[in-house]
Protein backbone atom coordinates (compact mmCIF):
# COMPACT_ATOMS: atom_id res chain seq x y z
CA UNK A 1 0.00 0.00 0.00
CA UNK A 2 1.24 3.47 -0.81
CA UNK A 3 1.35 6.32 1.63
CA UNK A 4 0.02 9.73 0.74
CA UNK A 5 0.16 13.14 2.32
CA UNK A 6 -3.00 14.21 4.02
CA UNK A 7 -5.40 17.08 3.55
CA UNK A 8 -9.12 17.29 2.65
CA UNK A 9 -11.89 18.91 4.61
CA UNK A 10 -15.44 20.25 4.32
CA UNK A 11 -18.53 21.90 5.68
CA UNK A 12 -21.82 23.59 4.50
CA UNK A 13 -25.63 23.71 3.76
CA UNK A 14 -27.50 25.38 0.90
CA UNK A 15 -29.36 24.91 -2.34
CA UNK A 16 -30.48 25.75 -5.81
CA UNK A 17 -31.84 23.73 -8.68
CA UNK A 18 -29.43 21.06 -9.86
CA UNK A 19 -30.85 21.62 -13.31
CA UNK A 20 -28.27 24.39 -13.50
CA UNK A 21 -25.45 21.97 -12.73
CA UNK A 22 -23.40 23.13 -15.72
CA UNK A 23 -22.80 26.43 -13.95
CA UNK A 24 -19.97 25.87 -11.53
CA UNK A 25 -19.87 27.36 -8.12
CA UNK A 26 -18.50 30.90 -8.16
CA UNK A 27 -16.48 31.76 -5.11
CA UNK A 28 -14.84 34.95 -4.02
CA UNK A 29 -11.68 33.83 -2.32
CA UNK A 30 -8.35 35.36 -1.47
CA UNK A 31 -5.05 33.62 -2.18
CA UNK A 32 -3.37 34.71 1.01
CA UNK A 33 -0.84 32.67 2.89
CA UNK A 34 1.17 29.53 2.31
CA UNK A 35 -0.32 26.10 1.97
CA UNK A 36 -0.60 24.67 5.48
CA UNK A 37 1.56 21.66 6.19
CA UNK A 38 -0.50 18.67 7.24
CA UNK A 39 0.11 15.48 9.15
CA UNK A 40 -0.93 12.14 7.83
CA UNK A 41 -2.27 10.68 11.09
CA UNK A 42 -5.63 8.91 11.15
CA UNK A 43 -8.79 10.94 11.48
CA UNK A 44 -11.25 9.81 14.13
CA UNK A 45 -14.00 7.62 12.74
CA UNK A 46 -17.24 9.56 12.45
CA UNK A 47 -20.81 8.36 12.26
CA UNK A 48 -22.04 7.62 8.79
CA UNK A 49 -23.97 10.50 7.23
CA UNK A 50 -26.96 8.20 7.03
CA UNK A 51 -27.94 5.02 8.80
CA UNK A 52 -29.51 3.42 5.74
CA UNK A 53 -27.53 3.27 2.49
CA UNK A 54 -29.32 2.59 -0.76
CA UNK A 55 -27.19 0.70 -3.28
CA UNK A 56 -26.94 3.29 -6.01
CA UNK A 57 -23.66 2.27 -7.62
CA UNK A 58 -20.86 -0.25 -7.73
CA UNK A 59 -18.07 2.27 -7.25
CA UNK A 60 -14.91 1.21 -5.45
CA UNK A 61 -13.83 1.97 -1.92
CA UNK A 62 -10.38 3.47 -1.53
CA UNK A 63 -8.72 1.85 1.46
CA UNK A 64 -5.24 1.87 -0.05
CA UNK A 65 -3.34 4.93 1.16
CA UNK A 66 0.28 5.12 0.03
CA UNK A 67 3.21 6.07 2.21
CA UNK A 68 2.95 9.66 3.33
CA UNK A 69 5.07 12.24 5.08
CA UNK A 70 4.36 13.59 8.55
CA UNK A 71 4.40 17.35 8.33
CA UNK A 72 2.22 18.80 11.05
CA UNK A 73 0.09 17.88 14.05
CA UNK A 74 -3.50 19.06 14.35
CA UNK A 75 -4.29 22.33 16.07
CA UNK A 76 -6.83 21.61 18.80
CA UNK A 77 -7.10 25.17 20.09
CA UNK A 78 -9.78 26.34 17.67
CA UNK A 79 -13.53 25.90 17.78
CA UNK A 80 -15.54 24.10 15.14
CA UNK A 81 -16.64 27.13 13.12
CA UNK A 82 -15.35 27.32 9.54
CA UNK A 83 -15.11 31.06 8.79
CA UNK A 84 -14.37 30.72 5.08
CA UNK A 85 -17.95 29.66 4.39
CA UNK A 86 -19.71 32.50 6.17
CA UNK A 87 -19.76 35.00 3.32
CA UNK A 88 -20.97 32.68 0.54
CA UNK A 89 -24.64 32.82 -0.46
CA UNK A 90 -24.44 30.87 -3.66
CA UNK A 91 -26.63 28.73 -5.85
CA UNK A 92 -26.91 25.81 -3.43
CA UNK A 93 -28.19 28.06 -0.68
CA UNK A 94 -31.03 25.87 0.65
CA UNK A 95 -29.76 22.41 -0.21
CA UNK A 96 -29.57 19.85 2.58
CA UNK A 97 -28.54 16.24 2.95
CA UNK A 98 -32.22 15.29 2.91
CA UNK A 99 -32.35 16.25 -0.77
CA UNK A 100 -30.33 13.11 -1.57
CA UNK A 101 -30.61 9.36 -1.36
CA UNK A 102 -27.29 8.19 0.04
CA UNK A 103 -25.65 5.19 -1.59
CA UNK A 104 -22.49 3.24 -0.90
CA UNK A 105 -19.12 4.70 0.02
CA UNK A 106 -16.92 5.33 -3.02
CA UNK A 107 -13.80 6.28 -1.10
CA UNK A 108 -12.38 7.24 2.28
CA UNK A 109 -9.94 10.02 3.05
CA UNK A 110 -8.34 11.52 6.13
CA UNK A 111 -11.11 14.04 6.77
CA UNK A 112 -14.14 12.38 5.32
CA UNK A 113 -15.77 10.00 2.90
CA UNK A 114 -17.13 10.12 -0.63
CA UNK A 115 -20.59 8.67 -1.28
CA UNK A 116 -22.60 7.88 -4.35
CA UNK A 117 -25.83 9.89 -4.04
CA UNK A 118 -28.99 10.52 -6.05
CA UNK A 119 -30.71 13.88 -6.03
CA UNK A 120 -34.33 13.06 -5.20
CA UNK A 121 -35.91 15.78 -7.34
CA UNK A 122 -33.93 15.34 -10.56
CA UNK A 123 -32.60 11.80 -10.30
CA UNK A 124 -29.09 13.09 -10.94
CA UNK A 125 -26.37 10.70 -9.71
CA UNK A 126 -23.44 12.53 -8.10
CA UNK A 127 -20.47 11.96 -5.85
CA UNK A 128 -20.83 13.63 -2.46
CA UNK A 129 -17.71 14.29 -0.42
CA UNK A 130 -18.62 14.67 3.27
CA UNK A 131 -16.00 16.27 5.50
CA UNK A 132 -15.95 17.07 9.21
CA UNK A 133 -15.96 20.77 10.14
CA UNK A 134 -14.21 20.03 13.40
CA UNK A 135 -11.29 18.39 11.66
CA UNK A 136 -10.98 21.17 9.10
CA UNK A 137 -10.35 23.52 12.00
CA UNK A 138 -8.24 21.10 14.07
CA UNK A 139 -5.83 20.63 11.20
CA UNK A 140 -5.91 24.35 10.29
CA UNK A 141 -6.76 23.69 6.66
CA UNK A 142 -9.47 26.32 6.15
CA UNK A 143 -7.40 28.10 3.51
CA UNK A 144 -6.57 24.83 1.83
CA UNK A 145 -10.23 23.85 1.66
CA UNK A 146 -11.13 27.26 0.28
CA UNK A 147 -8.47 26.91 -2.41
CA UNK A 148 -9.54 23.37 -3.30
CA UNK A 149 -13.13 24.50 -3.87
CA UNK A 150 -12.07 27.57 -5.84
CA UNK A 151 -9.66 25.63 -8.05
CA UNK A 152 -11.93 22.70 -8.83
CA UNK A 153 -14.86 25.06 -9.36
CA UNK A 154 -12.93 26.89 -12.08
CA UNK A 155 -12.35 23.81 -14.25
CA UNK A 156 -14.21 23.03 -17.45
CA UNK A 157 -12.34 20.12 -18.98
CA UNK A 158 -13.44 16.61 -19.91
CA UNK A 159 -10.48 15.03 -18.08
CA UNK A 160 -11.03 16.87 -14.77
CA UNK A 161 -13.86 16.02 -12.39
CA UNK A 162 -16.48 18.75 -12.20
CA UNK A 163 -17.55 20.42 -8.98
CA UNK A 164 -21.27 21.30 -8.97
CA UNK A 165 -21.28 23.14 -5.66
CA UNK A 166 -21.21 22.73 -1.89
CA UNK A 167 -23.51 22.89 1.12
CA UNK A 168 -23.14 22.34 4.85
CA UNK A 169 -24.89 21.48 8.08
CA UNK A 170 -23.91 21.63 11.76
CA UNK A 171 -21.21 18.97 11.58
CA UNK A 172 -20.02 18.66 8.01
CA UNK A 173 -19.27 20.31 4.71
CA UNK A 174 -20.39 18.54 1.53
CA UNK A 175 -18.86 18.91 -1.92
CA UNK A 176 -21.21 17.84 -4.71
CA UNK A 177 -19.21 16.49 -7.63
CA UNK A 178 -19.44 14.63 -10.89
CA UNK A 179 -19.86 10.88 -10.49
CA UNK A 180 -17.44 8.79 -12.57
CA UNK A 181 -18.84 5.32 -13.08
CA UNK A 182 -15.93 2.86 -13.00
CA UNK A 183 -14.06 4.41 -10.10
CA UNK A 184 -10.37 4.53 -9.31
CA UNK A 185 -7.64 3.63 -11.75
CA UNK A 186 -5.71 2.30 -8.73
CA UNK A 187 -8.30 -0.37 -8.04
CA UNK A 188 -8.48 -1.27 -11.72
CA UNK A 189 -4.72 -1.83 -11.82
CA UNK A 190 -4.80 -3.78 -8.58
CA UNK A 191 -7.51 -6.12 -9.88
CA UNK A 192 -6.39 -6.44 -13.51
CA UNK A 193 -2.66 -5.82 -13.57
CA UNK A 194 -0.70 -3.59 -15.99
CA UNK A 195 -2.36 -2.11 -19.07
CA UNK A 196 -1.54 -2.92 -22.67
CA UNK A 197 0.34 -0.15 -24.46
CA UNK A 198 -2.67 0.97 -26.49
CA UNK A 199 -4.81 1.69 -23.45
CA UNK A 200 -1.88 3.04 -21.44
CA UNK A 201 -0.98 5.48 -24.21
CA UNK A 202 -4.58 6.70 -24.35
CA UNK A 203 -4.63 7.30 -20.60
CA UNK A 204 -1.28 9.10 -20.70
CA UNK A 205 -2.49 11.30 -23.56
CA UNK A 206 -5.60 12.28 -21.58
CA UNK A 207 -3.53 12.99 -18.48
CA UNK A 208 -1.17 15.19 -20.49
CA UNK A 209 -4.24 17.03 -21.79
CA UNK A 210 -5.60 17.59 -18.30
CA UNK A 211 -2.27 18.77 -16.89
CA UNK A 212 -1.62 21.02 -19.88
CA UNK A 213 -4.99 22.67 -19.20
CA UNK A 214 -4.26 23.07 -15.49
CA UNK A 215 -0.81 24.49 -16.13
CA UNK A 216 -2.26 26.94 -18.67
CA UNK A 217 -4.35 28.28 -15.76
CA UNK A 218 -1.19 28.44 -13.58
CA UNK A 219 -2.36 25.60 -11.34
CA UNK A 220 -0.26 22.68 -10.09
CA UNK A 221 -1.95 19.43 -9.06
CA UNK A 222 0.91 18.05 -6.90
CA UNK A 223 -0.68 14.69 -6.08
CA UNK A 224 -0.92 12.69 -9.28
CA UNK A 225 -1.32 8.94 -8.70
CA UNK A 226 -3.76 6.20 -9.78
CA UNK A 227 -5.87 6.74 -6.63
CA UNK A 228 -6.66 10.25 -7.90
CA UNK A 229 -7.64 9.22 -11.42
CA UNK A 230 -11.15 7.94 -12.18
CA UNK A 231 -12.28 5.86 -15.15
CA UNK A 232 -15.50 6.76 -16.94
CA UNK A 233 -17.30 5.47 -19.99
CA UNK A 234 -15.38 4.86 -23.22
CA UNK A 235 -12.07 4.76 -21.32
CA UNK A 236 -12.29 8.44 -20.51
CA UNK A 237 -10.23 9.24 -17.43
CA UNK A 238 -10.68 12.17 -15.07
CA UNK A 239 -8.16 13.61 -12.65
CA UNK A 240 -9.67 14.32 -9.24
CA UNK A 241 -8.79 15.30 -5.66
CA UNK A 242 -7.42 18.83 -5.80
CA UNK A 243 -6.62 19.11 -2.10
CA UNK A 244 -2.91 19.68 -2.81
CA UNK A 245 -3.50 21.84 -5.88
CA UNK A 246 -2.12 25.36 -5.76
CA UNK A 247 -1.76 28.47 -7.89
CA UNK A 248 1.63 29.01 -9.47
CA UNK A 249 1.35 32.42 -11.08
CA UNK A 250 4.15 34.41 -12.67
CA UNK A 251 6.57 31.50 -12.65
CA UNK A 252 6.46 31.44 -8.85
CA UNK A 253 8.45 28.66 -7.20
CA UNK A 254 6.86 26.54 -4.48
CA UNK A 255 8.52 24.95 -1.43
CA UNK A 256 5.85 22.88 0.36
CA UNK A 257 6.63 19.18 0.50
CA UNK A 258 3.50 17.28 -0.53
CA UNK A 259 2.33 14.34 -2.59
CA UNK A 260 2.91 10.60 -2.44
CA UNK A 261 6.36 9.20 -1.73
CA UNK A 262 6.63 7.00 -4.83
CA UNK A 263 5.67 9.99 -7.00
CA UNK A 264 7.91 12.66 -5.47
CA UNK A 265 10.34 14.37 -7.83
CA UNK A 266 14.03 14.89 -6.96
CA UNK A 267 13.56 18.60 -6.27
CA UNK A 268 10.81 17.83 -3.74
CA UNK A 269 12.99 15.28 -1.94
CA UNK A 270 15.89 17.75 -1.82
CA UNK A 271 13.59 20.51 -0.50
CA UNK A 272 14.34 22.74 -3.47
CA UNK A 273 11.98 25.26 -4.96
CA UNK A 274 9.84 23.75 -7.69
CA UNK A 275 7.27 24.54 -10.37
CA UNK A 276 4.84 22.65 -12.62
CA UNK A 277 7.58 20.25 -13.69
CA UNK A 278 6.77 18.21 -10.56
CA UNK A 279 3.54 17.21 -12.31
CA UNK A 280 5.50 16.24 -15.42
CA UNK A 281 7.72 13.98 -13.32
CA UNK A 282 4.64 12.41 -11.72
CA UNK A 283 3.23 11.74 -15.19
CA UNK A 284 6.41 9.78 -15.92
CA UNK A 285 5.96 7.70 -12.77
CA UNK A 286 2.31 7.12 -13.70
CA UNK A 287 3.22 6.02 -17.24
CA UNK A 288 5.63 3.45 -15.84
CA UNK A 289 3.08 2.19 -13.31
CA UNK A 290 0.41 1.79 -16.00
CA UNK A 291 2.73 -0.43 -18.04
CA UNK A 292 4.49 -2.33 -15.25
CA UNK A 293 1.95 -2.41 -12.43
CA UNK A 294 4.11 -0.70 -9.80
CA UNK A 295 5.97 2.64 -9.52
CA UNK A 296 9.53 2.67 -10.92
CA UNK A 297 11.34 3.54 -7.69
CA UNK A 298 9.25 1.58 -5.19
CA UNK A 299 11.26 0.04 -2.33
CA UNK A 300 10.62 -1.29 1.17
CA UNK A 301 11.60 1.93 2.94
CA UNK A 302 11.19 5.62 2.27
CA UNK A 303 14.96 6.14 2.37
CA UNK A 304 15.61 3.46 -0.25
CA UNK A 305 12.91 4.90 -2.49
CA UNK A 306 14.42 8.38 -2.16
CA UNK A 307 17.87 7.11 -3.12
CA UNK A 308 16.53 5.51 -6.29
CA UNK A 309 14.56 8.63 -7.21
CA UNK A 310 17.63 10.85 -6.78
CA UNK A 311 19.65 8.52 -9.01
CA UNK A 312 16.79 8.28 -11.54
CA UNK A 313 17.38 4.55 -11.19
CA UNK A 314 15.01 3.19 -13.85
CA UNK A 315 14.75 -0.53 -14.54
CA UNK A 316 12.46 -1.61 -17.37
CA UNK A 317 10.92 -5.06 -17.86
CA UNK A 318 11.46 -6.53 -21.32
CA UNK A 319 7.80 -6.12 -22.26
CA UNK A 320 7.98 -2.29 -22.22
CA UNK A 321 8.48 -1.08 -25.79
CA UNK A 322 11.45 1.13 -26.76
CA UNK A 323 9.12 4.03 -27.60
CA UNK A 324 7.40 3.83 -24.22
CA UNK A 325 10.79 3.68 -22.50
CA UNK A 326 11.90 6.76 -24.41
CA UNK A 327 8.90 8.78 -23.22
CA UNK A 328 9.30 7.65 -19.62
CA UNK A 329 13.01 8.49 -19.60
CA UNK A 330 12.27 11.94 -21.04
CA UNK A 331 9.62 12.55 -18.39
CA UNK A 332 11.82 11.33 -15.53
CA UNK A 333 14.76 13.67 -15.96
CA UNK A 334 16.55 14.77 -12.79
CA UNK A 335 16.73 18.39 -13.93
CA UNK A 336 13.20 19.85 -14.22
CA UNK A 337 14.12 21.99 -17.24
CA UNK A 338 15.10 18.87 -19.19
CA UNK A 339 11.74 17.14 -18.79
CA UNK A 340 9.72 16.85 -21.97
CA UNK A 341 6.99 19.53 -22.33
CA UNK A 342 3.41 18.28 -22.13
CA UNK A 343 2.73 19.48 -25.67
CA UNK A 344 5.48 17.14 -26.88
CA UNK A 345 4.15 14.29 -24.75
CA UNK A 346 0.90 14.44 -26.73
CA UNK A 347 2.76 14.17 -30.02
CA UNK A 348 5.43 11.69 -28.91
CA UNK A 349 6.01 8.69 -31.20
CA UNK A 350 4.63 6.25 -28.64
CA UNK A 351 1.37 8.21 -28.47
CA UNK A 352 1.20 8.78 -32.22
CA UNK A 353 1.81 5.14 -33.12
CA UNK A 354 -0.91 3.90 -30.76
CA UNK A 355 -3.49 6.58 -31.52
CA UNK A 356 -4.95 4.71 -34.48
CA UNK A 357 -5.93 1.80 -32.22
CA UNK A 358 -7.71 3.86 -29.56
CA UNK A 359 -11.07 3.51 -31.31
CA UNK A 360 -10.79 -0.27 -30.93
CA UNK A 361 -10.54 -0.13 -27.15
From Swiss-Prot:
Amino-acid positions noted as binding ATP in the UniProt annotation, renumbered to this chain: 106-114, 129
A Pfam cross-reference name: Pkinase
Cellular component per GO, a single term: kinetochore
Catalytic activity annotation: L-seryl-[protein] + ATP = O-phospho-L-seryl-[protein] + ADP + H(+); L-threonyl-[protein] + ATP = O-phospho-L-threonyl-[protein] + ADP + H(+)
UniProt cross-references to CDD domains, sorted A to Z: STKc_Aurora
Recorded GO MF terms: ATP binding; protein serine kinase activity; protein serine/threonine kinase activity
Active-site feature positions: 223 (proton acceptor)
UniProt-annotated stretches for the region Disordered: 1-68
Subcellular location: Nucleus; Cytoplasm, Cytoskeleton, Spindle; Chromosome, Centromere, Kinetochore
Residue span(s) of domain Protein kinase: 100-351
PROSITE patterns cross-referenced by the UniProt entry: PROTEIN_KINASE_ATP (PS00107), PROTEIN_KINASE_DOM (PS50011), PROTEIN_KINASE_ST (PS00108)
Enzyme class: transferase
Keyword list, A-Z: ATP-binding, Cell cycle, Centromere, Chromosome, Chromosome partition, Cytoplasm, Cytoskeleton, Kinase, Kinetochore, Nucleotide-binding, Nucleus, Serine/threonine-protein kinase, Transferase
Alphabetized InterPro entries for the sequence: Aur-like (IPR030616), Kinase-like_dom_sf (IPR011009), Prot_kinase_dom (IPR000719), Protein_kinase_ATP_BS (IPR017441), Ser/Thr_kinase_AS (IPR008271)
GO-annotated biological processes: chromosome segregation
SUPFAM superfamilies per UniProt: Protein kinase-like (PK-like)
The EC number(s) this enzyme carries: 2.7.11.1
Function noted in UniProt: Component of the chromosomal passenger complex (CPC), a complex that acts as a key regulator of chromosome segregation and cytokinesis. Has a role in error-correction of aberrent kinetochore-microtubule attachments to ensure that sister kinetochores become bioriented and connect to opposite poles by promoting spindle assembly checkpoint signaling.
Similarity remark: Belongs to the protein kinase superfamily. Ser/Thr protein kinase family. Aurora subfamily.
Record's protein name: Aurora kinase
Species per Swiss-Prot/TrEMBL record: Kluyveromyces lactis (strain ATCC 8585 / CBS 2359 / DSM 70799 / NBRC 1267 / NRRL Y-1140 / WM37)
Amino acid sequence: MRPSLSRDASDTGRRHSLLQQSKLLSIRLSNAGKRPSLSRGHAHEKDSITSSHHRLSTGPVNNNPRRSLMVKKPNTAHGTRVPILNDHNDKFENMTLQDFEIGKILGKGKFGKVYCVKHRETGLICALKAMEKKEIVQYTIQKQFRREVEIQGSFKHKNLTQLYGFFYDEKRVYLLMEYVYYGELYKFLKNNGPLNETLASYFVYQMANALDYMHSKNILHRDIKPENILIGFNNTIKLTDFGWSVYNEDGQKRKTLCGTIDYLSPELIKSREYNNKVDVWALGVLTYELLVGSPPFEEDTKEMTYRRILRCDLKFPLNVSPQARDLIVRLLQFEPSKRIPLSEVKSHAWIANNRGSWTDL
